[in-house]
């Protein structure tokens, strides 16, 4: 397949080169012709000559000479390359070629007969302008006979050579959209390799305490780019490293990109990593510092470094001088932390593109070049030779911090970060457990390993009162939470005591302020019912007087026909009547006299001389009242929806075309009756969803309480869900939950279709669905990463933890409820379910009984006026995982066997909060015996219940048994180990415990015999006073022999 050349791109770019040359700025002013020659050298990775070729043609052409004259261009290359260049040599009839000089192609011969071609090029140079000065890339020196003979030919002619590296670099620094897409792809691959491979590998090394050399880890990163899973869908053949990854730690730091990773072992302190990946010849770069257990001082210095990067991003704007950018950052260092001025890197980054580092676009104090929209920079800031005061070992005393990103200069506003790898302390910090916690866990693991047949009794003697099971730890933590809960709730309610809740009064509707404003219609004079649509009033004759009633006072109307008469019955709202759920029960003047109902009667028989029947007026009144009532109620409902709506700021539109955008999404709830597709776009201060019909829904970042991303793993839709702080209006309703989703598979299945297990169509469909899921997930993740970068991570998307999910029914149907870091959510079903954990006071589990397969969960909020949330039908198997999750979130939970009347409970608390907490507060939900006073006694009695208690026969046999039987008994009652909670019993050995058990057993048996004798005497006394019908019934089941009844 022939290699194609992008002709349009060539013409655009060569015109830009000539345009800048003809402007005559800087070195261009002195140049008569430009000569670029490229030889063969495998060691040269970056050179201006090859960069210019790649920029113009898309490929690197070795052993090729390019001469750019004032009115012509000459390319000399091998026959095969000349064939490739013929695609742009024929410019006739090509409108894109207008303004670009004509091309002459010369074929390079393999022998030394190239003199005639060299002479043609020399002649062309002499004819171009003054023909004396040539622009060259002085640093580019290629070996080989062909290059040597050409350079000798140039030197013989005595041309003045001027280095034009800087001006050509500035010309090609502004990237076109196609180039930017390649650089964005390169940046995303770099981010993927860092996140999914390097960061994970470092965490594994730290977790396992491995000894790994920097050089070995760097080699593994280079190998990782050969695997497709890290390349974000790119072809591995188009991906290469810009330079070998640089990994440094343990006090030896050199914050440059020319160094290599040493062979020292990685030290678990500040670990700097720099890596750059090249995609289709375009470079990207990323630098991060991973910190293991950083001290507070290290974290403060790192946060200051992030602040400097933010300042640098703000200064990188179109038209600003590069030196001004550098000075602005240095001013921040001088003002806030002058002691770090000599620690910061000498330059703050450099221009990047086809070449990794553009020397003429370095961000330092001397660079006078102006920034232009479309330039891409690698910004790199770091502090070296910092002293760690808490460091004890030599490698811990010195550390460095280094961060860097690939960024794009925009027209207005700060530069856009292309490498979307999070860099806050919480994202790059690796916090380990302290040694005490590790030792505890190790001891626990060793103890578990020791547990075996015959060893349990031995282990029981070693168990101390300080050792706790997971359940005991959970209970202890819950006990602490219970004490905190009551104290905080009491304090909160005390603070709220002064706030009086404003009771909403029912609106008084006055139709006419005085009688003169009433309409003068004939119907009113004729004592007929008249409806004034303008003032929404029904004027009725009452005792011969036209009386106005506003439509709001009418509850309902009914009409019936009985014989020759039509009856119209009108019912009114009045105190004491049953009102609708949304109607207030408060009247402006409840002491006034109210009309409850009025009934009118009219004849259905037309009298002689009348045109219509009298009942027609009632029929018309009935119809019009219904219409007016409907219109009034619709308007009232809309006004009620608008009540309490907080006015939002206006959305600031970002006119940049590179805004994060997702297409082909549906919105829930629907804007119209039918669902419509649209696109979601992120702007400066919020999102805008635009439907295909043109409807717009704006969601501001500062109004988002929870931003959730529900991947399509195990689901039929992929969702972005926004739970809002304040409701927004669209579709004439208020909404606090808005989500955008797209379907990933067939929601419905054709049951009539005959399917075969190995049907190719089905297999192909499944493969297509898998690819679609992966594609959608990648698109959504890229969108989220761009949004988080755009908002400086002020808006962070939460992904539900599916592993912690459990089934339950918060509404009518069962769904999978999944925790996130700050909420409990279900976003796939509608209506959605979102509970913010910070607003939760406590969780109560109801109907927790052994014989039931499921239980209910009640969520009580800190705002006691808010209705509790019920989640029904949760499987019992989920109880322990839910408890563990709630405990880890520091949420108090209780459980009980009954369902409680929560409406009554919450009303009692709200009415008398002080009395509620004086009586123990929420402790009434605790199971009996878990109070603070009775806890020790309960634990002791529990131990007594669970301790091995032999029967009388067993006791007699034990006298003759060997010691081996004790170990078997201990094995059978290993749970007694867990029940030894008191200080006294945990300190005694097995023999002493057995002896105590025998004594307790003998005492209990004696007490039982005493109790039986007392009960027998009571029964005998009762039988004396009875009639004798059941006299023998009481002694029938007694263990004592029956005695004769006294007479």
Swiss-Prot record:
Ubiquitous. Residues 499-514 have a biased composition (Polar residues). ADP-ribosylated. ADP-ribosylation by PARP1 is induced by genotoxic stress and correlates with dissociation of FACT from chromatin. Residues 492-518, 918-1047 are annotated as: Disordered. There is a cross-link at residues 497, 513, 647 (Glycyl lysine isopeptide (Lys-Gly) (interchain with G-Cter in SUMO2)). The keyword Plastid does not apply. Component of the FACT complex, a general chromatin factor that acts to reorganize nucleosomes. The FACT complex is involved in multiple processes that require DNA as a template such as mRNA elongation, DNA replication and DNA repair. During transcription elongation the FACT complex acts as a histone chaperone that both destabilizes and restores nucleosomal structure. This is FACT complex subunit SPT16.
């Amino acid at each position: 397949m022939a290699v194609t050349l992008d002709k349009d791109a060539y013409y655009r770019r060569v015109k830009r080169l000539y345009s800048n040359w003809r402007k005559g700025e800087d070195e261009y002013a002195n140049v008569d012709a430009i000569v670029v020659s490229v030889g063969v050298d495998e060691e040269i990775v970056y050179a201006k000559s090859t960069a210019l070729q790649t920029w113009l043609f898309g490929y690197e052409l070795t052993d090729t000479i390019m001469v750019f004259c004032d009115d012509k261009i000459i390319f000399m290359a091998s026959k095969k390359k000349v064939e490739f260049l013929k695609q742009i040599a024929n410019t006739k009839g090509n409108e894109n070629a207008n303004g670009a000089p004509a091309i002459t192609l010369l074929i390079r011969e393999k022998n030394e007969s190239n003199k005639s071609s060299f002479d043609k090029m020399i002649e062309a140079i002499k004819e171009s302008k003054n023909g004396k000065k040539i622009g060259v890339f002085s640093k580019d020196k290629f070996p080989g006979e062909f290059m040597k003979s050409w350079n000798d030919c140039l030197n013989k002619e005595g041309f003045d050579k001027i280095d034009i590296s800087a001006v050509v670099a500035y010309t090609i620094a502004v990237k076109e959209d196609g180039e930017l897409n390649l650089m964005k792809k390169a940046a995303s691959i770099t981010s993927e390799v860092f996140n999914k491979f390097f960061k994970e590998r470092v965490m594994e090394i730290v977790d396992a305490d491995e000894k790994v050399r920097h050089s070995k880890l760097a080699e593994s990163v280079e190998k990782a780019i050969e695997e497709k899973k890290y390349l974000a869908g790119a072809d591995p053949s188009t991906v290469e490293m810009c330079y070998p990854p640089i990994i440094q730690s343990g006090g030896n730091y050199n914050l440059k990109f020319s160094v290599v990773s040493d062979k020292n072992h990685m030290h678990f302190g500040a670990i700097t990593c720099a890596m750059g990946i090249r995609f289709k010849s375009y470079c990207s770069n990323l630098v991060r510092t991973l910190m293991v257990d950083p001290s507070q001082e290290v974290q403060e210095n790192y946060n200051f470094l992030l602040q400097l990067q933010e300042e640098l991003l703000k200064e990188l704007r179109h038209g600003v001088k590069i030196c001004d950018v550098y000075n602005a950052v240095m001013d921040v260092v001088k003002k806030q932390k002058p002691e770090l001025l000599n620690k910061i890197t000498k330059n703050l980054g450099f221009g990047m593109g086809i070449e990794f580092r553009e020397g003429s676009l370095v961000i330092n104090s001397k660079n006078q070049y102006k920034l232009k929209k479309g330039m891409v920079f690698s910004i790199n800031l770091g502090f070296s030779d910092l002293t760690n005061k808490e460091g004890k070992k030599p490698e811990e005393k010195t550390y460095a911090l280094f961060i860097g990103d690939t960024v794009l200069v925009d027209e207005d506003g700060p530069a856009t970060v292309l490498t979307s790898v999070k860099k806050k302390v919480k994202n790059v910090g690796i916090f380990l457990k302290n040694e005490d916690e590790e030792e505890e866990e190790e001891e626990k693991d060793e103890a578990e390993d020791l547990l075996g047949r015959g060893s349990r009794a031995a282990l029981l003697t070693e168990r101390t009162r300080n050792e706790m099971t997971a359940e005991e730890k959970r209970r202890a933590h819950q006990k602490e939470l219970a004490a905190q809960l009551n104290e905080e709730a009491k304090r909160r309610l005390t603070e709220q005591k002064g706030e009086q809740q404003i009771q909403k009064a029912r609106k008084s509707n006055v139709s006419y302020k005085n009688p003169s404003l009433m309409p003068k219609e004939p119907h009113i004079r004729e004592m007929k019912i008249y409806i004034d649509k303008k003032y929404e009033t029904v004027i009725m004759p009452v005792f011969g007087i036209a009386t106005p009633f506003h439509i709001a006072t009418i509850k309902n109307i009914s009409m019936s026909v009985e014989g020759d008469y039509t009856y119209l019955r009108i019912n009114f709202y009045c105190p004491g009547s049953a009102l609708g759920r949304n109607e207030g029960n408060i009247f402006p003047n409840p002491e006034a006299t109210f009309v409850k109902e009025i009934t009118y009667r009219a004849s259905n028989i037309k009298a002689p001389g009348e045109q219509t029947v009298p009942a027609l007026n009632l029929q018309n009144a009935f119809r019009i009242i219904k219409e007016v009532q409907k219109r009034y109620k619709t308007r009232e409902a809309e006004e009620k929806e608008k009540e309490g709506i907080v006015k939002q700021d206006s959305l600031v539109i970002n006119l940049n075309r590179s805004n994060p955008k997702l297409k082909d999404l549906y919105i829930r709830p629907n804007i119209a009756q039918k669902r419509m597709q649209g696109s979601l776009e992120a702007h400066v201060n919020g999102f805008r969803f635009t439907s295909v019909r043109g409807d717009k829904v704006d969601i501001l970042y500062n109004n988002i309480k929870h931003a959730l991303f529900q991947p399509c793993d195990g689901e039929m839709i992929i969702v972005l869900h926004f739970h809002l702080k304040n409701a927004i209006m669209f579709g004439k309703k208020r909404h606090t939950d808005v989500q955008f989703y797209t379907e990933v598979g067939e929601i419905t299945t054709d049951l009539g279709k005959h399917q075969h297990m190995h049907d190719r169509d089905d297999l192909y469909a499944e493969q297509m669905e898998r690819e679609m899921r992966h594609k959608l997930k990648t698109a959504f993740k890229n969108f989220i990463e761009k949004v988080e970068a755009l908002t400086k991570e002020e808006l962070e998307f939460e992904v539900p933890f599916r592993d912690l999910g459990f089934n339950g029914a918060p509404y009518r149907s069962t769904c999978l409820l999944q925790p996130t870091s700050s909420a409990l959510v279900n976003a796939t079903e509608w209506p959605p379910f979102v509970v913010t954990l910070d607003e939760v006071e406590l969780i109560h589990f109801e109907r927790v009984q052994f014989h039931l397969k499921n239980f209910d969960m009640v969520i009580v909020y800190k705002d006691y006026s808010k209705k509790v949330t019920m989640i029904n039908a949760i499987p019992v198997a989920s109880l322990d995982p839910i408890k563990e999750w709630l405990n880890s979130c520091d949420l108090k939970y209780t459980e009980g066997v009954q369902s409680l009347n929560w409406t009554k409970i919450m009303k009692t608390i709200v009415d008398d909060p002080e009395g509620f907490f004086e009586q123990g507060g929420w402790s009434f939900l605790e199971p009996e015996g878990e109070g603070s006073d009775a806890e020790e006694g309960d634990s002791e009695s529990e131990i007594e219940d669970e301790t091995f208690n032999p029967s009388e026969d067993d006791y007699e046999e034990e006298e003759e048994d060997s010691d081996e039987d004790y170990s078997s008994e201990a094995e059978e009652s290993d749970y007694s180990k867990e029940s030894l909670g008191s200080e006294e019993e945990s300190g005694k050995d097995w023999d002493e415990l057995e002896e105590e058990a025998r004594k307790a057993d003998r005492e209990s048996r004696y007490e039982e015999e005493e109790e039986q004798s007392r009960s027998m005497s009571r029964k005998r006394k009762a039988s004396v006073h009875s009639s004798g019908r059941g006299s023998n019934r009481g002694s029938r089941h007694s263990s004592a022999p029956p005695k004769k009844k006294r007479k």
